[in-house]
């Protein structure tokens, strides 16, 4: 049998990946599955299927695609073959997500339709990148927060994103994830490359300054598509978060996306990342 996948949102990239996510309705645990037998044989990426997608879905799925591109770029499994794909996806998302979000199908414009088409392509490109390079703790955190509090995946991704970038983009004595091709810790350098590629920082700017510029531009992007990037602003009860903190931290640590993250997190660091999102 052949599997033919036709995406109807511009986010997950599932049409070209070996991944699936399941949620246990009883325990509220969300967990990814990975097996190359899950990869479709054919992907039909037709933007006609997303021209009437609601704005909210456009914003959340678009930020999910951005995270796929960012995490695959800084992953310990990234390579010369995946990084260009990640970069093109990042470029398309920065340039088109806001226009795609504000597009009104009731009053169609060529610019809006093109933006939705570009976002659809970007999501699949990001899927191609992370199908080979995998993801990181932005997704680990979002899986567990989303499952526990019932937040849409892309929203949980957006909330965790700036904290994960700051956590990864450090220098000095860093506990890096061991991987044969990842011999020196370079996450800050990788994020800085993205920032310079997008024109957010110049070649004379330090890597630290370039990363700060990238985080600032991502904040502008989430603001432009009306995403509140705090747990408190999305109805999460702090007492509930604190009560489940130990359990959530363990689940994040064990998530299938954690091993490819460039910085290997300790349980106490994961707890702080969870609290910082509030």
Can you describe what each PLM-predicted range is?
Residues 63-71, 87-98, 120-124, 138, ...:
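Predominant activation on well-ordered alpha-helical scaffold segments within soluble catalytic domains
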Residues 238-278:
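Short, amphipathic C-terminal "tail helix"
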Residues 155-243:
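Gly/Pro-rich interdomain helix-loop hinge
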Residues 55-125, 129:
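C-terminal and late-domain segments of enzyme folds
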Residues 1-80, 171, 186-197:
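A glycine/threonine-rich phosphate-anchoring loop and its flanking beta-alpha core
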Residues 77-85, 102-118, 133-138, 176, ...:
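Flexible, glycine/charged-enriched surface loops at secondary-structure junctions
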Residues 11, 124-157, 254-260:
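Glycine-rich phosphate/pyrophosphate-binding beta-alpha loops
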């Amino acid at each position: 049998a052949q599997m033919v996948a036709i995406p109807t949102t511009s986010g997950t990239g599932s049409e070209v990946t070996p991944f699936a996510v399941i949620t246990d309705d009883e325990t509220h645990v969300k967990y990814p599955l990975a097996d190359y037998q899950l990869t479709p044989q054919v992907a039909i990426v037709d933007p006609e299927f997303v021209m009437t997608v609601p704005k909210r879905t456009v914003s959340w799925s678009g930020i999910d695609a951005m995270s796929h591109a960012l995490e695959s770029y800084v992953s310990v499994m990234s390579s010369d073959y995946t990084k260009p794909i990640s970069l093109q996806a990042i470029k398309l998302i920065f340039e088109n997500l806001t226009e795609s979000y504000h597009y009104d199908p009731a009053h169609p414009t060529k610019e809006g339709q093109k933006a939705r088409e570009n976002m659809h392509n970007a999501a699949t490109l990001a899927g191609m990148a992370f199908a080979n390079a995998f993801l990181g703790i932005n997704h680990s955190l979002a899986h567990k927060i989303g499952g526990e509090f019932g937040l849409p995946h892309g929203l949980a991704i957006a909330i965790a994103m700036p904290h994960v970038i700051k956590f990864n983009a450090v220098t000095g004595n860093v506990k890096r994830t061991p991987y044969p091709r990842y011999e020196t810790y370079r996450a800050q350098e990788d994020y800085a490359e993205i920032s310079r590629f997008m024109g957010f920082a110049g070649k004379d700017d330090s890597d630290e300054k370039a990363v700060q510029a990238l985080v600032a531009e991502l904040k502008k992007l989430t603001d432009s598509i009306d995403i509140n990037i705090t747990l408190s602003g999305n109805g999460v009860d702090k007492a509930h978060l604190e009560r489940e903190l130990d359990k959530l931290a363990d689940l994040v640590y064990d998530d299938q996306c954690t091993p490819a993250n460039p910085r290997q997190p300790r349980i106490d660091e994961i707890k702080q990342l969870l609290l910082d999102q509030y």
